[in-house]
Amino acid sequence: MSKKEQSLMTPYLQFNRSQWAALRDSVPMTLTEGEIARLKGINEDLSLEEVAEIYLPLSRLLNFYISSNLRRQAVLEQFLGTNGQRIPYIISIAGSVAVGKSTTARVLQALLSRWPEHRSVELITTDGFLHPNEVLKERGLMKKKGFPLSYDMHRLVKFVSDLKSGAPNVTAPVYSHLIYDRIPDGDKTVAQPDILILEGLNVLQSGMDYPHDPHHVFVSDFVDFSIYVDAPENLLQNWYINRFLKFREGAFTDPDSYFHNYAQLSEAEAVNVATALWNEINYVNLKENILPTRERASLILTKSENHAVDQVRLRK
């Protein structure tokens, strides 16, 4: 089979960096270098060039999809003779720990909110839907955070279902990485945004990923456009370890940090601890529960060194 024939067999259109960047068309840059610096994660290099070449074309594509979805809603309202409720367009972002999901989510939130339509964009992470530590300890799951069993999936599904049903105010629990737990009474209210970005390890998973807790609908059933942020496993491990080292010098030094004891480690000890955490927990979760969902995504961003995206795959 020729390469051309193979390319026709895949459900994705594939773009290298320059091909994708050309699809920006004339979309203006609406973020300053200072704003971009504030959006990036602790262990990432996010440049003006990266936003211009990767995220501006993506925001243009999403704007087309969102506008098309609004027209479809208007057609339905005209057919029914009703004034419909405001239904958010839901974008999900999945990928491994340390791949840069949160940065992708924050950049898209900033860009999409600055389109001429001035749409309201909310960002929610699924970390808030992890069971509280008290529950995880009772169930012996503290070392399985991020695995399917660790999430309150019924609450997460109800959250997205209520949003898609037009509920005026929906609450989401909020997670603190400082205390490594859900914040008691710290719920965030989401009030019918135009766009909701849902970021987390598990947003592409379906019912077959939760055989222990069967239910008829799943988060992915309510998502309009899904993104998977991908990278080679060796880079993911390096990024995870480097992020751990930066936390050791920063967030872990806070006496209130759940991981405060790690701040006392030497660099060599910290590397050993981070490597063990990666191999025993995060790598296992990636291989068993996250990576198998990649091909369910509408779009796959593949990163190389320095968190730079070098390939984009868009579902046909």
UniProtKB/Swiss-Prot annotation:
Residues noted as binding ATP in the record, renumbered to the chain: G95, S96, V97, A98, V99, G100, K101, S102
Entry EC number(s): 2.7.1.33
Gene3D superfamilies noted in UniProt: P-loop containing nucleotide triphosphate hydrolases (3.40.50.300)
One GO location term (cellular component): cytoplasm
Subcellular localization, as worded in the UniProt entry: Cytoplasm
GO annotation terms (biological process): coenzyme A biosynthetic process
UniProt enzyme class: transferase
Top-level taxon in the UniProt lineage: Bacteria
Catalysed reactions, semicolon-separated: (R)-pantothenate + ATP = (R)-4'-phosphopantothenate + ADP + H(+)
An MF annotation (GO) of this entry: ATP binding
UniProt KW keywords: ATP-binding, Coenzyme A biosynthesis, Cytoplasm, Kinase, Nucleotide-binding, Transferase
Any Pfam family: PRK
Biological pathway: Cofactor biosynthesis; coenzyme A biosynthesis; CoA from (R)-pantothenate: step 1/5
Location (main, coarse): cytoplasm
Record's keyword annotation contains NAD: no
Family in the record: Belongs to the prokaryotic pantothenate kinase family.
Classification via HAMAP family: Pantothen_kinase_1
Protein name: Pantothenate kinase
Species: Enterobacter sp. (strain 638)
Gene, per the UniProt record: coaA
